[in-house]
């Protein structure tokens, strides 16, 4: 995206929050109560309002449940689930096959705090897609910052009309490090798996330096030509068919030859902040354009690796540290903010990495890449704050 769109590395977070998806270095957004006696003595099934369908993710201490809902007197669909004493994190997901906007009305923790309410402290109001509402799918991730925890006990929710609500619930010990399995895919005929290996190494190095180990599987080539160039909208039928091929227990990276239509030139985008985890569906992966990272027939491996890592950050719940205009920032308290009021030196209304040097321009989740001159001079975006690392280490599909 350094033809103007390279700066748009990642479309604006709140475009996505009202989101269609997360464009590379884009961002998209981003909150119950019963007595919990004997929680530690009972199984999750005994304590949760779940159906009989349960899926254990291979190699992970994460289980997927569909939650039974009932219609309340207020007209909302209501349900509950119980987080055991060793609960680490959860992703509560809501689906609507018609692709109309869908969201939760409330999510209340065991202490009675509605984490989706603007009046609660802290809260995920207007941060979580599960509060804002998005087409076909939305979710709430806990923790999406260290200010939240998957408190043991009964959580309750109210939701608008939907097809189903499911939860990916991770249990185990408190993580000080993490391992995440990544599955790369490549489409088109211009580049092959070998062409992205250097970028995957860059991506792996970025996460390793921040306390996260990536297990990167061999790249899978998808030869069907309809997937060479796809829309960045995850409800698009072709994009949906591509992303649905991803593995449930992995972060799926789809290196496409290019985007189609007006999306062409964008570096990449994720299905949400976070996207889906633990279920194979249309929101279970990220898209990365190879054409947007090409210089002639050669791929810019450092930039491509940063883009892949950035979009993976979105998929696991990280926002842009600073959004395009320098007036919107992420929900973490330890990431640098680059304010328009004193850093937009050229007064164009867009915060560049150069203007924000020393103020988050080098963060992996800054909204746009360094320009070509800065990259040639060795500038990189590889840093993550302690709180950003926390979100990744607690991800439901990490171990």
How would you label these PLM feature ranges?
Residues 2, 22-60:
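Bacterial Sec-dependent N-terminal signal peptides
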Residues 213-293, 300:
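Active-site-proximal segments of metallohydrolase catalytic domains
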Residues 187, 192-217:
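A short alpha-helix/helix-coil micro-patch that ends at or immediately precedes a cysteine
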Residues 160-190:
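Exposed low-complexity, polar/acidic, P/S/T/G-rich flexible segments that act as propeptides
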Residues 108-168:
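Noncatalytic accessory or regulatory domains flanking protease catalytic cores in secreted, cell-surface
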Residues 30-32, 71-119:
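Acidic, Ser/Thr/Pro-rich low-complexity intrinsically disordered segments
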Residues 1-10:
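N-terminal secretory signal peptides that target proteins for export/translocation
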Residues 297-384:
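The catalytic-center signature of Zn2+-dependent metalloproteases
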